[in-house]
Amino acid sequence: MRGRPRPHAATRIVDRLKLHRRRLRLDGREYTIVGLRPGMDARFSTNHFHGTWHVLSDWRGARLLGRLLWGLAYQRIPGTLVLIDRMFLDPNPFDGEPADPIVLVPVRITALTAQAGRALRRRLPLEETADGTVRWHTPGLDAAVAAWRAKSDRSARPCLWSSAPSGTAGARAGRVGGLMTIAGDPDALREAAVSVHTLGDHAHEGMDYTAIDWPNGEVQVFRDYRQRVSAARVARQEVLAGLTAVPHPDDLRPLIWHRSTEVRRRQRVAPGPHS
């Protein structure tokens, strides 16, 4: 009988993280799909707003995503992809719309076609037994993060809030076959990894972000990401319950944004169980 992973063992985001490995044939090609194991306490979402694809999470998710990107730069098996499957996805924290699965692509060894992306999406969530586990090696990431922090000019960081965000020039973000993708060669993946891993270091009002292939992509994190997701779920339910007909998404979203703000306000002032 296959045992469940121990929570403390499955959720530590460190070098040599244990991940699942599956071999799939998609669009006539062999792929090695590396994914998170059940028990990993990390949550993500995606959305597309103002022409930009966003990966959304919290501080913890940024650390994990950074480690996944860094380790991917060292993979050598053609057809390797990293998948963040549906069980780790939330509705987005703004209007509660469903998230796309997230795939990380090392472009020097893997080509993800739209047909392969659609074939993979149709098979999600991947519930069949994994072919095995891998230890995700991230050599040099901690040193690279420490070096970035040592030379980071904190006084210059606030300029991000009045101009286009800085980020990584080499990695590319987009949507392929219904999957949100971040793709790049090894140098681009490592650069993106450090930029993502350090999100939260210079947060402004509980939020931080970094561009990936600006203006096409961005990773954005919130300190209260999970509370925002919860509020967006409630807001979407409340707004839809009060409508006789569902409006166009462009008209519906502002209603949910406004209601979500109200829900978060209610949650903050709600009395505790012993009040």
Regions found by a protein language model. Give the residues of each.
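Positively charged, low-complexity terminal tracts
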Residues: R2-S275
